[in-house]
Structure formats: structure tokens, C-alpha cells
């Protein structure tokens, strides 16, 4: 998909294109300067447990917004937007199994549903680029690679599961700067959780991500791993609630929140 026509659109204009079905691809590199968000939608009966899960696991699940039960408007992150239509792609999980992937969840929406918007590391990629740190999946025009790890999240109620991480390869001499830059943005995962040998995270093969597409690791480069907001999907697969709706990995919500609003220093 050619992203040129979409790169300079405002968040509202980009959401409108998505709502109309014009754009349904990964959102890395779009709406630079604005925060992007992952999605987890649960029924009200599970909402407190998931809120507690996020509170106990802020690295993979930093909350940007939570809707009122039955409301599909993220009033803090993007007033006037519609959670049901404004992501490029969604996933429907039933009893822990991926049932289908769709572009509009209006037919699946229920009056007691609560939506959680979770910060996404796409949000700090403009800052990485501005500081001379390359972002391979943007360079190569593909989705970021994501992996399940052997790091167990802190459970909450009946929710438990492994942390998922995203990976960005970079020259070894850029790693310190990448840590410095991303540490400013804890609301979108902050500093990396691991640098170097993927086997220490239980990742056997970087060429076979669990979500997204692989990035080439070139000579002299180091893999750098950040906690990822796809973690709730791994939790849904393990906890097996009757119905959960998420974004499709890499297909994020474009908020009206400026990256710099989320910076802490």
C-alpha cells in the first residue's frame, strides 16, 4: 500500500479515511507527532479485571483512555471519534481463539462494552528518526515484528499471560540514544525491556515473529525490544474470555494527543 497520500493527513482526516474503508493498512509512519493506540474491548463484567491488569503491568499496557460502558467515543484521546470504525482492522476473539478480522466492529458492539486505548510505540518513532535512530520497518514499508516472550505479566482476576514485545534492529552505536529518546515516553512503553540476545526472552527465531512481519538484522546491528500493546491479545488467548475485540497488530488508532504531551522530560 502506498502511504505517501496519507503521511501528512491530520489525525481526524486519517480517521475519516479509515472509517470510509479507504485505508486499512499498518499505521507506522503515519500522523507523525501524534500518539497511536492499541485496543482492547471487553464486556463490563471483565472491565475491572482488565483495568487492574493494566495497572499492574504498565510497561506493556500504559493506558491512554478508557470509555464509559457502552460508549464508543474516546473522549480524552480523540473527542468525536468512533472506536467501532476508526481502526484500520480489528480482531474478534471468542473463547481465546481468533474468530475473524474485520474493518468495522459496529455489528459486534454491545451496550455493556468498555474500550481501553493503550499507548503504542509507533508514537515515539518520529522522535527516534529525528535523533538519527533508524526504524527498519518504516524504511522497508512493512509491519513491525512482535514476539511472545517468557516474561510473565502480573495476573489480575482471571487474566494472565506473557508479555509481547516489538523489535527494532539498529546499529550498536545508536542503542544508547534510542534508550534515552524513548525513556521520555512511558505512556507509549518507554525505554526498551531488553537489548541483545533474543533467546533470553524465549524468542527462538527473529525471522518468525508471532505477529507482524520480520525485520532484517544486518551485520553490526543489535535487536532492541520494547514492551508491546499486543500483550492483551496474548492474554486473551490464554485466559479465553467469551468475547474480546482488539485491533489487528500494527493497525493502530490515531489519537489527537501530541507525542510531546506524553513526554515526561
Swiss-Prot record:
Entry keyword Lyase: yes
UniProt-listed SUPFAM superfamilies: PSTPO5379-like
Pfam (any one): D-Glu_cyclase
Gene Ontology MF term list: lyase activity
Keywords recorded for this protein, A-Z: Lyase
Residue ranges of coiled coil: none
Protein name: Putative hydro-lyase PST_2764
Amino acid at each position: 500500500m502506498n502511504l505517501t497520500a496519507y503521511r501528512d493527513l491530520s489525525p481526524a482526516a486519517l480517521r475519516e479515511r479509515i472509517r470510509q474503508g479507504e485505508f486499512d493498512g499498518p499505521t507506522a509512519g503515519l500522523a507523525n507527532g501524534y500518539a497511536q493506540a492499541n485496543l482492547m474491548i471487553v464486556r463490563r463484567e471483565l472491565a475491572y479485571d482488565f483495568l487492574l491488569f493494566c495497572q499492574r503491568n504498565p510497561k506493556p499496557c500504559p493506558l491512554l483512555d478508557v470509555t464509559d460502558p457502552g460508549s464508543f467515543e474516546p473522549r480524552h484521546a480523540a473527542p468525536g471519534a468512533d472506536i467501532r470504525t476508526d481502526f484500520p482492522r480489528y480482531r474478534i476473539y471468542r473463547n481465546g481463539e481468533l474468530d475473524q478480522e474485520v474493518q468495522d466492529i459496529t455489528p459486534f458492539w454491545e451496550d455493556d462494552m468498555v474500550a481501553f486505548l493503550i499507548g503504542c510505540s509507533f508514537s515515539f518513532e518520529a522522535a527516534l528518526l529525528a535523533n538519527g535512530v533508524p526504524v527498519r520497518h518504516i524504511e522497508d514499508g512493512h509491519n513491525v515484528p512482535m514476539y511472545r516472550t517468557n516474561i510473565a505479566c502480573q495476573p489480575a482476576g482471571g487474566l494472565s499471560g506473557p508479555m509481547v514485545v516489538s523489535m527494532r534492529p539498529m546499529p550498536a552505536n545508536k542503542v544508547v540514544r534510542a534508550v534515552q529518546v524513548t525513556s521520555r515516553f512511558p505512556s507509549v512503553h518507554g525505554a526498551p525491556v531488553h537489548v541483545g540476545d533474543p533467546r533470553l526472552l524465549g524468542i527462538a527465531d527473529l525471522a518468525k515473529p508471532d505477529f507482524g512481519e520480520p525485520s532484517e538484522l544486518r551485520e553490526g546491528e543489535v535487536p532492541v525490544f520494547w514492551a508491546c500493546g499486543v500483550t492483551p491479545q496474548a492474554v486473551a488467548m490464554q485466559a479465553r474470555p467469551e468475547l474480546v475485540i482488539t485491533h489487528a497488530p500494527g493497525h493502530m488508532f490515531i489519537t489527537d494527543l501530541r507525542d510531546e504531551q506524553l513526554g515526561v522530560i
